[in-house]
Amino acid sequence: MIDKSSADILEISAKCGYLTGLLKNVYRSANIIVTDMSPLLLDSFDHNHKLLIDDENLEFQKDSFDLIIYSLGLHWINDVQRFLYNIRTFLKSDGIFIGNFVGGDSLKNLRKSLIDNEIASGFKHSPHISPFIHFDHVPMLLLHAGFSEVIVDYENIALKFENPIVLMKEIKNIGESNALNSQHNYAISKKMFSLLKNYINVFEDNITLISFIAAPNKNSLRLKLL
């Protein structure tokens, strides 16, 4: 088990600090460092050890942490293999890395809807939705990064919205709007907006939430989860 009295914990991309609060309740005497790339989010909650830093530019000493947690962020990482390798080096030999992210065939209906409506509006298609890591690729990515034990699971979550525009607004409101948007040379036209908005039926889609636990050494997970 992780020693609750002296654990060194890193939470990457803490956002509004909800998970930070849960960690502080469980590991009351632990050294918990949290990071985020948004100063507004870091200022939104109280914690002694906060770092303003991009998720892909983390710099810590080797063997620094007993536990590293990364919730709903891996789908934003450009060089996933390099990121996972760095996480592995930050962990102590008996440490644990826990994370989840949006992956698989998430938002495939929205992706298709955008392509169809761009064609109907006379636009050349540009990517509106970032590519996702598939469930089957996760174990190999972690193993190649130096982890020896990996447990991966997933959950499909159904979405129902009035139309694609409402779904896109909700995605934007939770801070998950596409990083590729800045590369577009145009905004959604009035014609395309109308096509997306005037769906006859409820617009349905899904997201796949992929979760994993990984450890550098074999048997670490079994011993810690007993």
UniProtKB/Swiss-Prot annotation:
Class in the EC hierarchy, top level: transferase
Identify the keywords attached in UniProt to this record, alphabetized: Methyltransferase, Transferase
Q: What is its EC number?
A: 2.1.1.-
Q: Which GO terms describe its molecular function?
A: S-adenosylmethionine-dependent methyltransferase activity
Pfam families cross-referenced by the UniProt entry: Methyltransf_11
Domain of life (superkingdom): Bacteria
Q: Which InterPro entries match?
A: Malonyl-ACP_OMT, Methyltransf_11, SAM-dependent_MTases_sf
Methyltransferase is among the record's keywords:
yes
Listed under GO biological process in this entry are:
methylation
The entry sums up its family as follows:
Belongs to the methyltransferase superfamily.
Name of the protein in its database record: Putative methyltransferase RP459
